């Protein structure tokens, strides 16, 4: 239920912050995403999307009796937890944000949440951090963290259902070696094996290589009717799929 009340949670947090001290007409939202780094191409759409939503709120005048909402950007980098923590700390202490849209990649999101946002009582709403470790079933997040993308635990089940519906009983798996990739690969393996499927290999891959032919050869030698890739399209995922198709190692 908590995840279904994301809009209410953010609005409540923003309202409490905005009206504290008599500042009922101004709201500042941090847009905390990987404007640089391995998912820069995705964030090129995500960031403006958040800002467009804010502009619609301002035009409607429906939030907090026509409060003016301002967006302030900060860069998670996706991969550098230290930089991400420094960035969200600036949003909170220097920019005085009332809420944060972000982070994006699971590792930096978790670090920013636990080490900076929670101690400062700051709400975060992530559009893309999917690690099962961020579910916080024991209220470790104190009710301050929400996400609009489903956990990898759910994604692993859906991937399994798709493959089983196609009669695919064995697959090779490769994943980008970070919290996101490993979390998704592990969730998929658990669900797929529970459904009777066989994982022939579950191996990490390095991001951003020019050539993945050796990785594809190793995956193919392990066998499997299909190849499952848990990774970023621009940082190896797409290249692995293309190399698999080009070599004929996997046809889908």
Segments from the language model and where they lie:
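Glycine-rich phosphate-binding loop signature in dinucleotide/nucleotide-binding domains
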Residues: 91-97, 166, 219-224
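Extracellular/periplasmic bilobed ligand-binding domains
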Residues: 116-117, 185-252
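Short, low-complexity disordered leader/linker segments with a strong preference
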Residues: 1-28, 59
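Short, polar/charged alpha-helical segment
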Residues: 42-63, 187-193
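Extracytoplasmic ligand/sensor domains, especially the bilobed periplasmic-binding protein
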Residues: 97-202, 252
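Short beta-strand segments enriched in small/hydrophobic residues
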Residues: 26-45, 104, 170-174
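Immediate post-signal peptide segment of exported/extracytoplasmic ligand-binding proteins
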Residues: 19-31, 62-70, 163-169
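Beta-alpha junction/loop-to-helix N-cap segments that form part of ligand/metal-binding clefts
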Residues: 22, 41-48, 61-136, 148, ...
């Amino acid at each position: 239920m908590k995840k279904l009340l994301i809009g209410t949670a953010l609005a409540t947090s923003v309202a409490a912050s905005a009206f504290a001290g008599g500042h009922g007409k101004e709201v500042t939202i941090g847009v905390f995403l990987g404007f640089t780094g391995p998912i820069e191409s995705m964030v090129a759409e995500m960031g403006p999307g958040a800002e467009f939503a804010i502009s619609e709120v301002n035009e409607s005048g429906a939030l907090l009796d026509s409060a003016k909402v301002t967006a302030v950007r900060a860069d998670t980098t996706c991969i550098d937890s230290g930089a991400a923590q420094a960035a969200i700390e600036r949003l909170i202490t220097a920019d005085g944000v009332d809420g944060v849209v972000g982070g994006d990649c699971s590792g930096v999101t978790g670090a920013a949440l636990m080490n900076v946002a929670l101690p400062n009582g700051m709400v975060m709403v992530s559009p893309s951090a999917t690690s099962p470790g961020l579910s916080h079933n024991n209220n470790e997040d104190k009710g301050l963290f929400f996400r609009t993308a489903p956990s990898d635990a759910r994604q692993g089940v859906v991937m399994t259902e798709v493959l089983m519906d196609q009669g695919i009983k064995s697959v090779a798996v490769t994943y980008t070696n970070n919290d996101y990739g490993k979390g998704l690969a592990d969730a998929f393996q658990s669900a797929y094996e529970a459904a009777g499927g066989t994982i022939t290999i579950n191996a990490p891959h390095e991001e951003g290589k020019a050539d993945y032919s050796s990785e594809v050869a190793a995956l193919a030698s392990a066998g499997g009717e299909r190849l499952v890739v848990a990774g970023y399209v621009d940082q190896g995922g797409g290249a692995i799929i293309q190399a698999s198709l080009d070599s004929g190692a996997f046809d889908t």
